[in-house]
């Protein structure tokens, strides 16, 4: 990678002449350093010097002769950002999901990398952008070719992290100033290792020896990606908003089914409705049979199928013991679940069917190219509404407005529990719903640390 030129009279150089932020955080970070990364101090270059991305008045929609979000449109968008030397490589990118991923990352580079050259740094260094592009392609290729043990990741490790997360939030202080500190102690995790652990891994893949470029990449990752962007993702409001939308959709579907029953009179006496229900059940059984008999995905690591019974995975303990607390609320139901778990685990044929069903659900619903492509398209539309500059930050409710929204979420989730009779089956009370909602919306930094821990767990699963 080349050593880029810069203007020695620029006021930004004093910021870049400070020691590389990653160097002072080898191993564990100091509390002072962690606070600096999480606060909007006067030295935050991404808060001050990238203010052009927040000016929606200058945000002009990207123009293309092709339909928006089409393959040709996305390639045109990448062409407008990356240098000509990369256009041939971009043409060879697969449509799903590589092109969606590259388009999203290209817009980030345009807003926070490319905009520096010629304005803040008086040079047009296309080689640095090319190096970043190649790094992204290497990462995508590596992830696609990696054989991940989804059994351990989704059925053991992530449920275990969620369990410790909820327990720590429940046991932590109600004082917002002390929640994060107590949360770290209760989970036995030192947050000072994040996000520098990930930054050092990424920087180790770069071939540059330029201190300016390393400082730039260090600030880009620590203060923008793992700072502002991750802060937005970890906001409790977005979690509650997503949960609230799911509850509202369930309530609307339930209300629609109720209206249909009223319209048709007695549904049990309607032969057409009976035939429709039978067809629906047959389709469900056919889909389940297809999941359980289809071939396994190429990137699925199934080495532990014979070692651990499917129902012995921690996710079932998480739901029965940690989340619903059946041992205290419904001891008889809990004993039935444990008995069934014990006897079904002894049936090897049934275990193979359950594992194969799980593998195919993961392949078709979670890791499929369509799902990943849609996820990055959604992120692109949210952050870059005009496929140009980053949109203005969303104004989140605070104070009484947030408390009112939280109460609405509690009411909607309780209505869903009432709809499915979970208050009788699992002995759930409205106060339990309120405690759960208050718990998960207690602290943004705790949610952010959970995301870091999950990413760390995923990295550990990679070869």
Curated annotation (Swiss-Prot):
One of its GO terms (molecular function) is phosphatidylinositol-3-phosphate binding. Pfam families: PXA. It comes from the Eukaryota. GO terms for cellular component: nucleus-vacuole junction. One of its GO terms (biological process) is vacuole-ER tethering. Present with 259 molecules/cell in log phase SD medium. This is Uncharacterized protein YDR179W-A. It comes from Saccharomyces cerevisiae (strain ATCC 204508 / S288c) (Baker's yeast).
């Amino acid at each position: 990678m080349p050593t880029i030129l810069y203007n020695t009279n620029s006021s930004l150089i004093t910021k870049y002449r400070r020691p590389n932020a990653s160097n002072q955080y080898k191993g564990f970070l100091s509390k002072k350093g962690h606070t600096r990364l999480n606060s909007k101090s006067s030295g935050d270059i991404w808060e001050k010097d990238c203010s052009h991305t927040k000016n929606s008045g200058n945000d002009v929609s990207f123009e293309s002769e092709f339909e928006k979000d089409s393959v040709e449109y996305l390639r045109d968008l990448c062409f407008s950002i990356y240098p000509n030397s990369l256009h041939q490589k971009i043409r060879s990118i697969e449509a799903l999901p590589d092109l969606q991923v590259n388009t999203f990352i290209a817009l980030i580079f345009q807003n926070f990398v490319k905009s520096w050259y010629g304005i803040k740094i008086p040079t047009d260094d296309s080689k640095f952008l090319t190096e970043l592009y190649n790094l992204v392609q290497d990462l995508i290729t590596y992830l696609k070719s990696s054989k991940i043990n989804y059994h351990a990741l989704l059925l053991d490790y992530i449920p275990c992290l969620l369990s410790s997360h909820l327990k720590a939030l429940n046991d932590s202080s109600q004082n917002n100033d002390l929640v994060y500190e107590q949360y770290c102690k209760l989970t036995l995790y030192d947050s000072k290792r994040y996000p520098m652990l990930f930054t050092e891994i990424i920087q180790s893949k770069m071939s540059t020896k330029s201190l300016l470029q390393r400082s730039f990449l260090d600030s880009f990752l620590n203060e923008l990606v793992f700072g502002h962007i991750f802060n937005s993702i970890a906001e409790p409001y977005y979690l509650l908003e997503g949960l609230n939308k799911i509850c509202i959709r369930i309530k609307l579907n339930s209300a629609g089914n109720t209206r249909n029953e009223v319209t048709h009179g007695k549904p049990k006496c309607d032969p057409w409705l009976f035939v429709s229900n039978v067809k629906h059940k047959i389709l469900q059984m056919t889909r389940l049979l297809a999941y359980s008999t289809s071939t396994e995905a190429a990137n699925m690591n199934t080495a532990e199928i014979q070692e651990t019974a499917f129902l012995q995975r921690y996710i079932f303990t998480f739901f029965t013991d940690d989340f619903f607390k059946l041992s205290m609320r419904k001891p008889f139901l809990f004993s039935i679940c444990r008995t069934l778990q014990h006897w079904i685990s002894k049936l090897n044929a049934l275990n193979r069917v359950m594992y194969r069903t799980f593998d195919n659900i993961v392949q078709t619903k979670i890791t499929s190219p369509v799902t990943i492509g849609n996820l990055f398209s959604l992120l692109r539309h949210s952050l870059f509404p005009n496929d140009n500059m980053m949109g203005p930050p969303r104004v989140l409710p605070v104070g009484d407005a947030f408390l009112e929204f939280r109460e609405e979420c509690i009411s909607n989730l309780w209505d869903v529990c009432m709809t499915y009779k979970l208050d009788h089956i699992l002995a759930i009370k409205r106060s339990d719903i309120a405690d759960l909602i208050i718990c998960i919306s207690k602290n943004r930094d705790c949610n952010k640390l959970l995301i870091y821990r999950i990413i760390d767990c995923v990295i550990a699963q990679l070869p």
